[in-house]
Amino acid sequence: TYGSWRNNFMLVSDDIDKRSDRIIQETTEDIAEDVKAEKPFLNVLKIHADSFVQETTSGGDRYSLVNKAIFDALEVGAIVVNYFGHGGENGIASERIFDIINAQELNNPTKLNCFVTVTCEYTKFDNPLRETAGEFLFWNKKGGAISLITTTRRIYVNVGINFNKTLSQYLLSYGSDETISIAEALRRTKNDPMISNQPQRRLVFSIGDPALKLPIADPDIRITKLNNEAIASTTLVLNALSPAKIEGNVTNAQGAVLNNYNGVLTATIYDKDVERSTIGNDGTKDSNNELILMDFDALGEVIFRGQASVTNGEFAFEFIVPRDITVAEGNGKISLYSKENATLLDNRGYNYNIKIGGVNLNAPEDTIGPTINLFMNDENFVSGGITNENPTLLANFYDENGINTASGIGHDITAILDGDETNVFRLNDYYTAAIDDYKRGSLSYPFRDLSPGLHTLTVKAWDVYNNSSTQDIQFIVFDKDESLELTNVLNYPNPFINYTEFWFSHNSSDVLDVSIQIFTISGKLI
């Protein structure tokens, strides 16, 4: 489907189990930086496994937080997921950061990606006796990948490095706004002078429709004003707790405003990039006996994600900058995506000229937390009702100054299931403000494989002033082993002459076909 997820690009790197793995991590980082430079409208998410804490379990070393980060990012959506590292028929990385079971559990039916795995035997489709992780990812009826560029046999690291870097150039059409099909990008990669003499190029295949292209939107969306000043010349800095008004227009590639363009814009404002580092989980050292670490820049936190109407090619939106921005002044990023109402046209844009930092010392006071309304699966749900084992949380929010998504310490939008504070669900990335109204917003979050029975879900949110509110909802996950039961059957009006309505409760989470028969007191069917 259409949506701002089409501006997202995701890379995942293996950790460093041995010294020679260092180049895998560094290559992934190099590709990420190349993508940022060549396609600055893309929001590049880096998941370097070694920047997360590794856990030791009875089954071996694991990265549960990496697994969750991959799941969440895939369900939020990305046009490409590029994994570089070790892998095999059962998944990627020896720590099983995304395994064959995960490939079947993924639930992203409207945000299908191109999954790139230059690794060993991930999609060994030529063995009918053994189904592999890549095949399950492609077959996934709830989503998965719409296309894969993947391997059927073991591939050497040096070949993988050159192949991955070369592939990115063609897949994203560096230097051009004209995209080619995914399969054509692979063909050109294999015929590139860097790769054409490598026999192992024959181990990499395209799975999917050979005519399919990446869903990259057309250029361009441009920011023209910040707080009524021209964006190109303004010296304004967006301070914490200060109001912001951003104006712009949707144009063609030549910069002409599309005066007949009417639709909806999604704007995502990022704080300054964050400096991060890997942590050397496996204690692997280089030839100088120093722990192998890698510094890298990651996207800043989202300080606002909202929507605005586009009318005759023009748009404007407002918000209050959260208290939790990093105070030091620097350039953030505005990421823009819009969809035209009457056609299949969508556009994208970006701007790095916005400066963020400092604090508005004259901000009005606010001591009231946001209002939260919770539902499960649909907004007709009443607390205590029945759901399936994979329910979707729906949450609506309201606050006079807007909801905080800037991820200050302890200030995330969170959900806690059954009081388990060791397993907190962070929901910031799922929140979007309403169209033309930064005070209202909503999110939906899919839960997976919940146990049958009664559950209590607690959602906590903060406004941009860091006032918090919590709200609970209870729901009963239907036990598939139970027989169907109907209770509280009633009708109104009763008695009736020619019309009545029936209500009843049932213990099924499925859509039901209901047959009603009405008899007279003498037993005659009406």
Predicted regions and their residues:
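Cysteine-dependent hydrolase recognition
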Residues: 1-307, 311-320, 328-330, 338-360, ...
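Contiguous beta-strand segments within globular domains
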Residues: 11, 232-269, 380-412, 495-503
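Proline-centered linker/hinge motifs at extracellular inter-domain junctions
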Residues: 219-221, 362-374, 455, 484
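Surface-exposed, proline-enriched loop/turn segments that connect beta strands in immunoglobulin-like
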Residues: 226, 233-235, 376, 486-491
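Hydrophobic alpha-helical segments, especially N-terminal targeting/anchoring helices
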Residues: 251, 309, 462, 519-523
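Short, acidic/polar linear motifs in exposed loop/turn regions
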Residues: 252-254, 325, 399-401, 451, ...
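Long, low-complexity serine/threonine/glycine- and acidic-rich segments characteristic of extracellular
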Residues: 266-358, 373-380, 388, 394-479
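Glycine-centered coil/turn sites that cap beta-strands in beta-rich domains
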Residues: 478-522
